[in-house]
Protein backbone atom coordinates (compact mmCIF):
# COMPACT_ATOMS: atom_id res chain seq x y z
CA UNK A 1 0.00 0.00 0.00
CA UNK A 2 1.04 3.60 -0.56
CA UNK A 3 2.74 5.07 2.57
CA UNK A 4 0.65 7.69 4.35
CA UNK A 5 2.33 11.13 4.56
CA UNK A 6 3.51 11.92 8.10
CA UNK A 7 1.66 15.25 8.20
CA UNK A 8 -1.60 13.50 7.32
CA UNK A 9 -1.21 11.02 10.17
CA UNK A 10 -0.37 13.83 12.61
CA UNK A 11 -3.31 15.95 11.44
CA UNK A 12 -5.73 13.05 11.87
CA UNK A 13 -4.44 12.27 15.35
CA UNK A 14 -4.86 15.93 16.31
CA UNK A 15 -8.48 15.89 15.09
CA UNK A 16 -9.13 12.66 16.99
CA UNK A 17 -7.64 14.12 20.17
CA UNK A 18 -9.91 17.17 19.90
CA UNK A 19 -12.92 15.00 19.01
CA UNK A 20 -13.26 16.80 15.67
CA UNK A 21 -13.28 13.83 13.29
CA UNK A 22 -16.48 13.89 11.23
CA UNK A 23 -17.48 10.30 10.42
CA UNK A 24 -19.13 9.25 7.17
CA UNK A 25 -22.56 7.99 8.22
CA UNK A 26 -24.75 5.87 5.98
CA UNK A 27 -28.27 7.34 5.93
CA UNK A 28 -31.25 5.96 4.00
CA UNK A 29 -33.67 8.61 2.79
CA UNK A 30 -37.34 7.82 3.45
CA UNK A 31 -40.58 9.52 2.31
CA UNK A 32 -42.25 12.32 4.28
CA UNK A 33 -39.03 13.99 5.40
CA UNK A 34 -37.69 11.03 7.32
CA UNK A 35 -34.49 9.01 7.23
CA UNK A 36 -33.11 5.78 8.69
CA UNK A 37 -29.67 5.51 10.27
CA UNK A 38 -28.30 2.81 12.58
CA UNK A 39 -31.70 1.10 12.36
CA UNK A 40 -33.60 4.10 13.73
CA UNK A 41 -36.17 6.17 11.79
CA UNK A 42 -35.79 9.90 12.41
CA UNK A 43 -37.17 13.21 11.20
CA UNK A 44 -34.58 14.67 8.82
CA UNK A 45 -33.93 18.35 9.62
CA UNK A 46 -30.46 18.34 8.02
CA UNK A 47 -31.38 17.97 4.36
CA UNK A 48 -31.92 20.56 1.62
CA UNK A 49 -34.29 18.19 -0.19
CA UNK A 50 -37.09 20.74 0.25
CA UNK A 51 -39.62 19.12 -2.10
CA UNK A 52 -38.76 15.54 -1.19
CA UNK A 53 -37.81 14.65 -4.77
CA UNK A 54 -34.56 12.92 -3.79
CA UNK A 55 -36.54 10.47 -1.60
CA UNK A 56 -39.64 10.08 -3.79
CA UNK A 57 -40.46 6.36 -4.04
CA UNK A 58 -41.19 6.81 -7.74
CA UNK A 59 -37.44 7.25 -8.16
CA UNK A 60 -36.57 4.10 -6.21
CA UNK A 61 -33.53 2.41 -7.74
CA UNK A 62 -32.55 5.42 -9.84
CA UNK A 63 -32.51 8.42 -7.46
CA UNK A 64 -29.04 9.93 -7.06
CA UNK A 65 -29.66 13.26 -5.32
CA UNK A 66 -27.74 13.78 -2.08
CA UNK A 67 -30.11 16.43 -0.73
CA UNK A 68 -27.40 18.07 1.38
CA UNK A 69 -23.74 17.83 2.32
CA UNK A 70 -22.89 14.20 3.23
CA UNK A 71 -21.02 15.46 6.30
CA UNK A 72 -24.29 16.96 7.54
CA UNK A 73 -27.01 14.56 6.44
CA UNK A 74 -25.05 11.36 5.85
CA UNK A 75 -24.34 9.23 2.81
CA UNK A 76 -26.92 7.12 1.04
CA UNK A 77 -26.47 3.32 0.85
CA UNK A 78 -26.10 3.67 -2.93
CA UNK A 79 -23.17 6.06 -2.60
CA UNK A 80 -21.58 3.92 0.11
CA UNK A 81 -21.81 0.86 -2.12
CA UNK A 82 -20.32 2.76 -5.04
CA UNK A 83 -17.39 3.98 -2.94
CA UNK A 84 -16.73 0.43 -1.73
CA UNK A 85 -16.86 -0.91 -5.29
CA UNK A 86 -14.49 1.81 -6.49
CA UNK A 87 -12.08 1.04 -3.63
CA UNK A 88 -12.20 -2.67 -4.48
CA UNK A 89 -11.59 -1.93 -8.17
CA UNK A 90 -8.71 0.42 -7.38
CA UNK A 91 -7.30 -2.02 -4.77
CA UNK A 92 -7.32 0.63 -2.02
CA UNK A 93 -8.72 0.83 1.50
CA UNK A 94 -11.31 3.47 0.58
CA UNK A 95 -12.55 5.85 -2.10
CA UNK A 96 -14.21 9.25 -1.80
CA UNK A 97 -16.84 10.40 -4.30
CA UNK A 98 -17.17 13.87 -5.83
CA UNK A 99 -19.96 15.19 -8.07
CA UNK A 100 -17.57 15.50 -11.05
CA UNK A 101 -14.02 14.66 -12.01
CA UNK A 102 -13.33 18.39 -12.21
CA UNK A 103 -14.46 18.83 -8.60
CA UNK A 104 -12.40 15.82 -7.53
CA UNK A 105 -9.22 17.43 -8.86
CA UNK A 106 -9.82 20.94 -7.56
CA UNK A 107 -11.08 19.76 -4.18
CA UNK A 108 -8.33 17.23 -3.57
CA UNK A 109 -5.41 19.49 -4.51
CA UNK A 110 -6.77 22.41 -2.46
CA UNK A 111 -7.29 20.11 0.55
CA UNK A 112 -3.75 18.71 0.52
CA UNK A 113 -1.69 21.91 0.40
CA UNK A 114 -2.06 25.57 1.30
CA UNK A 115 -0.15 28.84 1.74
CA UNK A 116 3.51 28.18 2.51
CA UNK A 117 3.47 24.81 0.74
CA UNK A 118 4.84 24.02 -2.72
CA UNK A 119 3.14 22.46 -5.75
CA UNK A 120 4.99 21.14 -8.80
CA UNK A 121 2.48 21.09 -11.64
CA UNK A 122 3.07 19.62 -15.10
CA UNK A 123 2.78 22.21 -17.88
CA UNK A 124 0.22 20.08 -19.75
CA UNK A 125 -2.11 19.43 -16.81
CA UNK A 126 -5.88 19.67 -17.16
CA UNK A 127 -7.59 22.94 -16.20
CA UNK A 128 -9.15 21.32 -13.13
CA UNK A 129 -5.71 20.58 -11.68
CA UNK A 130 -4.52 24.09 -12.51
CA UNK A 131 -7.58 25.57 -10.75
CA UNK A 132 -6.93 23.37 -7.73
CA UNK A 133 -3.35 24.62 -7.57
CA UNK A 134 -4.52 28.24 -7.68
CA UNK A 135 -7.23 27.70 -5.08
CA UNK A 136 -4.79 26.09 -2.65
CA UNK A 137 -2.76 29.26 -2.18
CA UNK A 138 0.46 27.24 -2.36
CA UNK A 139 3.40 28.39 -4.47
CA UNK A 140 3.17 26.72 -7.88
CA UNK A 141 6.22 25.59 -9.87
CA UNK A 142 5.59 24.41 -13.44
CA UNK A 143 7.66 21.63 -15.03
CA UNK A 144 7.76 19.61 -18.27
CA UNK A 145 8.44 15.95 -18.98
CA UNK A 146 11.50 16.87 -21.06
CA UNK A 147 13.30 18.72 -18.25
CA UNK A 148 12.93 16.63 -15.13
CA UNK A 149 16.35 17.91 -14.09
CA UNK A 150 14.71 21.31 -13.59
CA UNK A 151 11.97 19.67 -11.52
CA UNK A 152 14.64 18.08 -9.33
CA UNK A 153 16.26 21.49 -8.82
CA UNK A 154 12.91 23.08 -7.91
CA UNK A 155 12.13 20.29 -5.46
CA UNK A 156 15.49 20.80 -3.81
CA UNK A 157 15.00 24.56 -3.56
CA UNK A 158 11.59 24.03 -1.91
CA UNK A 159 12.94 21.73 0.80
CA UNK A 160 11.78 24.21 3.45
CA UNK A 161 8.12 24.00 2.42
CA UNK A 162 6.09 22.03 5.00
CA UNK A 163 4.31 20.07 2.26
CA UNK A 164 5.37 19.39 -1.33
CA UNK A 165 3.04 17.97 -3.95
CA UNK A 166 3.81 16.85 -7.51
CA UNK A 167 0.66 17.04 -9.66
CA UNK A 168 0.29 15.45 -13.09
CA UNK A 169 -2.13 13.89 -15.52
CA UNK A 170 -1.42 10.21 -16.12
CA UNK A 171 -2.46 10.57 -19.75
CA UNK A 172 -2.41 14.10 -21.15
CA UNK A 173 -5.76 14.77 -22.79
CA UNK A 174 -4.59 16.98 -25.65
CA UNK A 175 -2.07 14.56 -27.18
CA UNK A 176 -2.49 11.19 -25.43
CA UNK A 177 1.11 11.18 -24.18
CA UNK A 178 1.80 9.29 -20.95
CA UNK A 179 3.46 11.07 -18.05
CA UNK A 180 6.90 9.73 -16.97
CA UNK A 181 5.39 8.32 -13.80
CA UNK A 182 8.28 6.11 -12.72
CA UNK A 183 10.72 9.04 -12.91
CA UNK A 184 8.27 11.32 -11.10
CA UNK A 185 7.87 8.75 -8.32
CA UNK A 186 11.67 8.52 -8.02
CA UNK A 187 11.85 12.30 -7.52
CA UNK A 188 8.91 12.31 -5.10
CA UNK A 189 10.62 9.73 -2.92
CA UNK A 190 14.02 11.42 -3.15
CA UNK A 191 12.64 14.80 -2.05
CA UNK A 192 9.95 13.52 0.35
CA UNK A 193 7.12 14.88 -1.78
CA UNK A 194 3.57 13.64 -2.26
CA UNK A 195 2.45 12.86 -5.79
CA UNK A 196 -1.08 13.07 -7.22
CA UNK A 197 -1.99 11.54 -10.59
CA UNK A 198 -5.18 12.35 -12.50
CA UNK A 199 -6.33 9.10 -14.15
CA UNK A 200 -9.23 10.65 -16.08
CA UNK A 201 -8.00 9.29 -19.42
CA UNK A 202 -6.30 6.19 -18.01
CA UNK A 203 -9.11 4.47 -16.10
CA UNK A 204 -10.57 1.60 -18.12
CA UNK A 205 -7.93 2.00 -20.83
CA UNK A 206 -4.47 1.37 -19.38
CA UNK A 207 -3.22 -1.35 -17.05
CA UNK A 208 -3.87 -5.08 -16.81
CA UNK A 209 -7.01 -4.51 -14.75
CA UNK A 210 -7.95 -1.19 -16.35
CA UNK A 211 -6.94 0.88 -13.33
CA UNK A 212 -5.02 3.36 -15.46
CA UNK A 213 -1.56 4.68 -16.20
CA UNK A 214 -0.25 4.11 -12.67
CA UNK A 215 -1.06 0.41 -12.91
CA UNK A 216 0.44 0.25 -16.40
CA UNK A 217 3.65 1.87 -15.13
CA UNK A 218 3.79 -0.35 -12.04
CA UNK A 219 3.74 2.59 -9.61
CA UNK A 220 0.33 2.30 -7.92
CA UNK A 221 1.96 1.65 -4.54
CA UNK A 222 4.28 4.64 -4.99
CA UNK A 223 1.66 7.25 -5.94
CA UNK A 224 0.16 9.02 -2.92
CA UNK A 225 -3.20 9.97 -4.46
CA UNK A 226 -5.03 8.93 -7.63
CA UNK A 227 -8.01 10.86 -8.95
CA UNK A 228 -10.50 9.33 -11.38
CA UNK A 229 -13.65 10.25 -13.25
CA UNK A 230 -16.78 8.28 -14.08
CA UNK A 231 -17.64 10.45 -17.09
CA UNK A 232 -15.25 9.00 -19.66
CA UNK A 233 -14.54 5.26 -20.01
CA UNK A 234 -17.10 4.40 -17.30
CA UNK A 235 -19.85 6.21 -19.21
CA UNK A 236 -21.57 7.93 -16.29
CA UNK A 237 -20.82 11.05 -14.25
CA UNK A 238 -18.94 11.83 -11.06
CA UNK A 239 -15.38 11.70 -9.79
CA UNK A 240 -13.42 10.03 -7.01
CA UNK A 241 -10.08 10.01 -5.21
CA UNK A 242 -8.22 7.01 -3.78
Question: Model features per residue range: what roles?
Answer:
Residues 4, 9-10, 14-65, 193:
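N-terminal "arm"/small-domain region of PLP-dependent enzymes with the aminotransferase-like
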Residues 64-101:
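Conserved N-terminal alpha-helix of the aminotransferase class I/II PLP-enzyme fold
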Residues 141, 145-197:
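Active-site phosphate-binding strand-loop segment of PLP-dependent enzymes
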Residues 111, 128-137:
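Active-site-proximal loop->helix
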Residues 108-127:
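Conserved PLP-anchoring active-site segment centered on the Schiff-base-forming lysine
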Residues 115, 135-137, 191, 222:
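Short, structured coil segments at secondary-structure junctions
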Residues 215-242:
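Active-site PLP attachment segment
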Amino acid sequence: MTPEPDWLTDALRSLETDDLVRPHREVELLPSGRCRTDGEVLLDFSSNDYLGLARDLRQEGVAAGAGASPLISGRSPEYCRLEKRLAAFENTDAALLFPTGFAANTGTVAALVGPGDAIFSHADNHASLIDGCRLSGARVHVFTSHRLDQLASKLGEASGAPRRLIVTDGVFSMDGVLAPLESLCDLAEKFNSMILVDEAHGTGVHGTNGRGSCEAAGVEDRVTFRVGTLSKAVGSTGGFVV
